[in-house]
Curated annotation (Swiss-Prot):
Name of the protein: Toxin CfTX-1
Subcellular location: Secreted; Nematocyst; Target cell membrane
Function description: May cause profound effects on the cardiovascular system of anesthetized rats (at 25 ug/kg), since the fraction containing this toxin and CfTX-2 produces an initial increase in mean arterial pressure, followed by cardiovascular collapse in all animals within 1 minute of injection. To note, the same fraction does not induce significant change in heart rate. Has weak hemolytic activity. Is lethal to crayfish. Causes cutaneous inflammation in humans. May act as a pore-forming toxin, disrupting normal transmembrane ion concentration gradients in susceptible cells.
GO CC annotations, alphabetized: extracellular region; membrane; nematocyst; other organism cell membrane
UniProt note on tissues of expression: Nematocytes.
Annotated source species: Chironex fleckeri
Amino acid sequence: MVKMLFFAFLPLLFMTGIAAESTISSGLNSLKTKIDAKMPSGKQLFDKVVEMQKQIDAKFSNDDERAKVMGAIGSLSTAVGKFQSGDPAKIASGCLDILVGISSVLKDFAKFSPIFSILSLVVGLFSGTKAEESVGSVVKKAVQEQSDQELQEALYGVKREYAVSKAFLDGVRNETSDLSPTEVSALAANVPIYQGVRFIAMVVQRIKYIKPKTESEIKRMLTMLELFTDLCSLRDLILLDLYQLVATPGHSPNIASGIKEVSNLGREEYKKVFEDLLKNDDKETYLFLSYLYPREKNEQSRKIFNFFDLMKVKYDDRLKQDLTGVKIFSNVHWPNYFMCSSNDYLALICTKPYGSLKLDKLNDGYYSIKTTQHDPKICHRYGNYILFTHKRNDDLEKFNFVPVKLEKREIYLLSSKESPNKFAYVPQNADGALFFVDGIPSKVGYGNQGYFTLVE
């Protein structure tokens, strides 16, 4: 009954914000007059609306701003049908529609945050239904994405400030006359030695404690990493330029020494963050590594690894190796069985390595797996298993060997460019096709059946 009352008047609630002269308060007051508060179900809905009104009035003192928010909600008439459908997925989609609409007119996250509380009141009407969990997950996801967006925008701002500082220092360097003591002090006081540290620390925390599990989360993480490397690289260059200028004989050795220590401290911090991230004995990072490796995969990946080299970050040396020519694939669970082609599909039915397969590195850093015969067949993923054919299959025939560790053993996970989140594994009986499964095989019940060793 509560839901019926609510949805009967929900269009009215939305419409109140479409006209510029309307406010959220007047719209909610109009809604309240339609509710029979004497009935138990009506009283529950009335209390929800009163609470919603208090929160909105407290946050949005400007009528025009409130009208914009309500207009964003009111323009999303399709969300009403989704709420009325009773289907959890559609209800969740409706919530997301509303969030996206509001975010399009509210760029200030401090004012955007209460909208989630308001939406939670609406979600509260679904208490005790199967829709509750679905809607809650959407709200949580939206909060995370909005938070990431705000953080990225802040990082872009600091990056711009660093770029201006770098240009300023380049101009100072081009001047041939010596710096006066006053100018040295001005440089040390105004070039942002400390600026951006807070935002760098925020990203560090995000990198350290969030383990991305989905494609969208991983892509957000990679974007964050790219921003982080840009920011840290610029900051390092600024500190280096400033140090070289201030360290000139006759200037201030104390300030120069301090700048050098700040630079060294930053480099050590960056190294620690990335070395922890790239620990290839942590199963929680395997999926993320499958998107990051190989380093030649794309411009973003190359950029990140170039920064690793600049900061002397330690990572698996096998990333620098070319696996072209590898001919034997052995499975950790079945070390005496080797991959070979049979009846147009790849299977672990060979008890002796006949050298019938080989790897060829492609220009994007992935590998093709081919037979060594005169007219070679090309391996490609087909659904959840692998076929050998003469037909080209683009990204499906591009494979990624992700270097990981198992009890100090150097091994590989096998995925494809088309689906980095799917990994190959060998059947328990070591007979039949090589299969792919969503997620890390060892984490979804396949033990060591998803780990491989490669031999030239």
